UniProtKB/Swiss-Prot annotation:
Coiled-coil blocks: none
Keywords in alphabetical order: Cytoplasm, Glycosyltransferase, Purine salvage, Transferase
Record protein name field: Adenine phosphoribosyltransferase
Pathway entry: Purine metabolism; AMP biosynthesis via salvage pathway; AMP from adenine: step 1/1
A cellular-component GO term for this protein: cytoplasm
Entry function: Catalyzes a salvage reaction resulting in the formation of AMP, that is energically less costly than de novo synthesis.
Family that this chain belongs to: Belongs to the purine/pyrimidine phosphoribosyltransferase family.
Domain of life per record: Bacteria
Localization of this protein: Cytoplasm
Lineage summary: Bacteria, Bacillati, Bacillota, Bacilli, Bacillales
Gene Ontology molecular functions: adenine binding; adenine phosphoribosyltransferase activity; AMP binding
SUPFAM superfamilies xrefs: PRTase-like
Subunit structure of this chain's protein: Homodimer.
Length: 170
């Protein structure tokens, strides 16, 4: 399936100069979204996944149906102040700013094989920070899966040594 047919490009959002890749048309088409999730699940099935981890917020949209299909848990990575129990945190940069990501301290057991999912790989800052959180808790990142990769931002360079799946590249 040609997933790019379901991505809307929004100019100058969230700020001038950004060409935002809107995945909501893909999500709105049940067959297209199922096909995208199925491709990630097929990839994950080769990895013996114990847990799916996804950063806020669109990583939840991708990760939850993948974890459901794999019959494994999902651990959310959230912005600072959004998780109610004890967390670990890491600072990170993204395509259009700076932020802090957190995960519950007990979200990952040492040795768990983790798939990280998100909608988009841009500069790689969000996923690099997510990997740091997973590894600080003793998880083993066995793959990263994205709907969209912005190749011109070289985010994949930050994921050297990790297996990466992207369904679309711009």
């Amino acid at each position: 399936m040609e997933f790019k047919n379901y991505i809307e490009i929004v100019e100058d959002w969230p700020k001038e100069g950004i060409k935002f890749k809107d995945i909501t048309p893909l999500m709105a088409d049940g067959k297209a979204f199922k096909s995208a999730v199925d491709e990630i699940v097929d990839y994950a099935n080769t990895k013996e996944i114990d847990l799916v981890v996804g950063p806020e917020a669109r990583g939840f949209i991708v990760g939850c149906p993948v974890s459901y299909a794999l019959e494994v848990g999902f651990a959310p990575v959230r912005k600072e102040g959004k998780l109610p129990r004890e967390v670990i945190k890491v600072d990170y940069g993204l395509e259009y700013g700076e932020n802090v990501l957190t995960i519950h301290k007990d979200a990952i057991k040492p040795g768990q094989r983790v798939l990280i999912t998100d909608d988009l790989l841009a500069t790689g800052g969000t996923i690099e920070a997510t990997i740091k959180l997973v590894e600080q808790l003793g998880g083993i990142v066995v793959g990263c899966a994205f709907l969209v990769e912005l190749g011109y931002l070289d985010g994949k360079d930050k994921l050297e040594g990790y297996d990466v799946l992207t369904l679309m590249k711009y």
